[in-house]
């Protein structure tokens, strides 16, 4: 069984939401709402988004978390609570959850490290703390010396999503084959290094999955 392919889509203008229809052949579509100048406007479009709910991941990432525009904590808390009440899947940073009382059951809890490698103990503690209730715990770390030794043991957990922040797209494919729950790709333009166009990623993973299935390899 292959991992779920996430097509990440930057919503730069609210009108871009109409383009969701173009990416419904992906398993999931990540709406990167932090590209919007005024993120609070999304409250007016919950009814529109509702028909795509089963396909969507809503991401509100501020600059400290690798986002594009700064989002005030109080606005983010308000929107996440609204999204929770309406049953949307969202992605929230573990550090934000530790500062704010927010529900995360059946949601994606992330930890992004951009400039240094965390210890294996640190990431294991995050997985242990959040994995029981979360839909997935996502760990993203840079491709510095020793990063594979930190990421690969995490794949024993069926809820884990790992992202090697490497320029080599093969690494994203590899972790998906090794057990990452989600593999992130791009819908229109790469939003992170190493991302592959989602249609190509689906073809690659389906081909490998079919080859394994037909050969009887388990």
Question: Predicted regions span which residues?
Answer:
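Conserved N-terminal beta1-alpha1 strand-loop-helix module at the mouth
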Residues: 1-67
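Catalytic beta/alpha-barrel core
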Residues: 8-10, 28-38, 59, 80, ...
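Short, acidic/polar
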Residues: 9-24, 72-82, 118-129
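Acidic (Asp/Glu)-rich catalytic clusters
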Residues: 19-25, 40-56, 81-85, 98-107, ...
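Structural recognition of alpha->loop->beta junctions
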Residues: 25-27, 73-92, 127-138, 174-196
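Active-site-adjacent beta->alpha loops and helix N-cap segments on the catalytic face
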Residues: 35-49, 93-106, 118-122, 143-156, ...
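C-terminal alpha-helical cap/extension of soluble enzyme domains
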Residues: 152-218
């Amino acid at each position: 069984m292959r991992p779920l392919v996430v097509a990440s889509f930057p919503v730069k203008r609210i009108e871009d939401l109409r383009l969701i229809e173009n990416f419904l052949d992906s398993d999931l579509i990540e709406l990167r709402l932090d590209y919007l100048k005024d993120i609070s406007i999304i409250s007016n479009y919950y009814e529109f988004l509702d028909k795509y709910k089963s396909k969507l991941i809503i991401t509100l990432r501020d600059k400290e978390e690798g986002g594009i525009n700064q989002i005030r904590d109080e606005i983010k808390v308000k929107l996440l609570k609204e999204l929770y009440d309406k049953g949307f899947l969202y992605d929230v940073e573990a550090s934000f959850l530790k500062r704010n009382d927010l529900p995360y059951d059946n949601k994606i809890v992330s930890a992004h490290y951009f400039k240094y490698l965390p210890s294996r103990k640190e990431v294991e503690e995050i997985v242990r703390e959040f994995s029981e209730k979360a839909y997935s715990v996502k760990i993203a770390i840079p491709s510095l010396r020793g990063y594979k030794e930190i990421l690969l043991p995490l794949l024993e957990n069926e809820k884990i999503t790992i992202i090697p922040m490497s320029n080599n797209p093969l690494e994203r494919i590899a972790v998906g084959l090794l057990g990452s729950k989600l593999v992130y790709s791009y819908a229109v333009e790469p939003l992170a290094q190493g991302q592959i166009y989602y249609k190509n990623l689906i073809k690659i993973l389906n081909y490998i999955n079919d080859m394994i299935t037909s050969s009887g390899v388990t």
